[in-house]
């Protein structure tokens, strides 16, 4: 990976670092380079790399990379466990406490899940979980004709003004919170506690790769995953496949499952997976532009 800026020389070794960027942009490589040069623990901030069932398919650091510097929160969650941004934040807090106790508290947090990085640097509202029966009711309502519009009508005015009403998942989440707690999600978010990492005391970086460079890298990386055995990873999970499970959201998993089930050939599965990955990268860029404009953007490729 070639950076346009001599970033290593500009980083204070005493400050934590947060590195965002679209998939396949080289975040993990940069984090490892920083850890080797300045010390620190590389901490995963990718919601798909937490699952123990995926290493190749989610491009987790290799065992060799993990041996070069301390890594944390990679592949540590079993597929049958529930996991959330709140659980991830609690684990990061534990790492920070452990680091303070040992005198090795510098974290290099890297990943493409903007929600994780945003919660770490801005705080996360503590909202009671949604009971299964409320979730089932919401799932049923949102599938009905006009169900989403009814959900929007039920929301309080502050929440309607705050959330993206074009996003069904956001609307359903807000409806579930209101139905469960009797309070709008905007009211809960107004009570957001201070962030675990003070943005003013950290280096906040966003890798911003050239689009053509990234598209070529995405395609090359997925084919390399297949060569290294990603299809076998998916085959091992096929008996447990549930497309609604969080671990099943790994990019490329649905496409490879379709191949293993005999619905498409491997070339078509790879083609679709590469397209899905590019679409995911586009969505990541959109999130970063909206939420991380004040971070330092680093151009790559091109």
Swiss-Prot record:
Cofactor: Mg(2+)
InterPro entries to which the protein is assigned, alphabetical: Dimethylallyltransferase, IPT, P-loop_NTPase
Pfam families: IPPT
Positions with a binding annotation for ATP: 21-28
Enzyme class per UniProt: transferase
Chemical reaction(s) catalysed: adenosine(37) in tRNA + dimethylallyl diphosphate = N(6)-dimethylallyladenosine(37) in tRNA + diphosphate
Disulfide bond positions: none
GO molecular function (one): tRNA dimethylallyltransferase activity
EC number: 2.5.1.75
This protein's UniProt keywords: ATP-binding, Magnesium, Nucleotide-binding, Transferase, tRNA processing
GO BP, sorted A to Z: tRNA modification
Positions bearing the site annotation: Interaction with substrate tRNA: 113, 135
Stored Gene3D superfamilies: 1.10.20.140, P-loop containing nucleotide triphosphate hydrolases
Binding site for substrate: 23-28
Record text on subunit structure and interactions: Monomer.
NCBIfam families the record matches: miaA (TIGR00174)
Stated family: Belongs to the IPP transferase family.
Its biological purpose: Catalyzes the transfer of a dimethylallyl group onto the adenine at position 37 in tRNAs that read codons beginning with uridine, leading to the formation of N6-(dimethylallyl)adenosine (i(6)A).
Annotated protein name in UniProt: tRNA dimethylallyltransferase
Source organism of this protein record: Paracoccus denitrificans (strain Pd 1222)
